[in-house]
């Protein structure tokens, strides 16, 4: 008894749901035994409603019969609903009723709309349909909309055909006007452009601005109309100064290749061949000796080149004897040095002509070709043509002497320049050596300064590290003192709790002893029921005492460890 009184009493546990249900059933059916109530609860899965119904059936047989009838009817209903065919029929019926309700709810609004539409718009001549007579089944989307769509498509197709015919008529008219313009252009070109002998770059640009060339004609879509090939390129454009800078004189195997190189390819070749002037063209010599084509506003097509070549062959066959009206002269072959000198003479001649005339450029026009010019082109000579006539050829000797003198002067100037360059190179080398020395001296100064800075930095870092260590030691000592104070306070708290727990245990033991004495005197029949509870209380008290003792020991050990660690620090 002393051990039982020493153990504290455990708190009461909250009742479970099963206990609550058992208590409610006991209140509802006080005459039934506890064993029956527990059995019914266990059979119903500890659910209150089915257990209540079962106990009610035990007490009242009429209620049991009613419950059986209700269960049989419910089972029949579930069996009927389980049939898939019956279920589908029921769902269809429900869906049909919902649709009928919706349709009937919107019927008056639909009738009002149809009546208003019929008042606003006049009656149309449309084919009668079976749905027109039924006022209730009338719908705009099913009856009127297809008719409107059909009429709209027919009107659109007719409009499309008319517009296509109108466009074709306009195109045919424009084709006829372009044919007339082409005929006028090829019949009388002198009205549009001036003669090649009097033409200049300014006049050509003004003529191009007044009437630019027409674009290439498109092929007609209908049979019967004339098909004409485009005489020019699809994208004509005016030539700039940059285009003329790349033009040079060259000698080629045929006049067709010469013309293609001058007009389309624009290849840059050494100016060492004779000037092959073509009929109808004019060339401009600028101050640099570069040749510009004055009337090459449009690029020639291959068909034009072939026609020109055929005309030259016919002229060659017709004319077998040379005439006196030629201005081109055939010059005998010379070595490579004579070619270069003759090429230089072109520049000198152009400068003299520019000085005499006080103009920026001089236009050299080519006369119609005779047999001598054709022979000159056929021989494929690489010698330059110095002038237009024999008088120009006689002056080439003097010009060549002048050029030789100029070349000698230029060589002397080059030698002087080479000497000056060597002197500059020697000066540059000396300057570089002095610069290298200055750079090395600066580097040595910088390295010395860096070493001094590094020493001062190392000293500063050492002092900083010492100060940081001192601060860390101070903070560690403060932390140890704080920990010791905390451990002391914890020990005091533990002692106070122990004393409080001892006093509480004494009080509880006294009260328990009094209560047990009263209970023993009052009820002897309850001893058998209270023995297992007391055993449970003893075990629980023993476990609680063990746990409390372990917790106290652990706290004491932790406090001792903290004290030891504080002493060590």
Curated annotation (Swiss-Prot):
Q: Which portions of the sequence form the region Disordered?
A: 67-139, 175-275, 311-569
**Domain CUE, residue spans:** 17-60
| Family matches, as SMART domains | CUE (SM00546)
Q: Which keywords does this Swiss-Prot/TrEMBL entry list? A: Cytoplasm, Ubl conjugation pathway
Q: Which GO terms describe its cellular component?
A: cytoplasm
Q: Where is the composition biased (Low complexity)?
A: 250-274
- Which intervals carry biased composition (Polar residues)? 347-364
Coiled-coil region: none
Q: What is its main location?
A: cytoplasm
Entry-linked InterPro entries: CUE, Cue5/Don1_CUE, UBA-like_sf
Q: Which PROSITE patterns match?
A: CUE
Question: Which SUPFAM superfamilies would you find in this protein's record?
Answer: UBA-like (SSF46934)
State any GO BP term from the record: signal transduction
Compositionally biased intervals (Basic and acidic residues): 79-100, 234-249, 329-340, 367-381, 399-500, 507-558
Q: What GO molecular-function term can you cite, just one?
A: ubiquitin binding
Locations listed in the record:
Cytoplasm
Chain intervals with Basic residues compositional bias: 104-113
Gene3D superfamilies, A to Z: DNA helicase RuvA subunit, C-terminal domain
This one is known as: CUE domain-containing protein 5
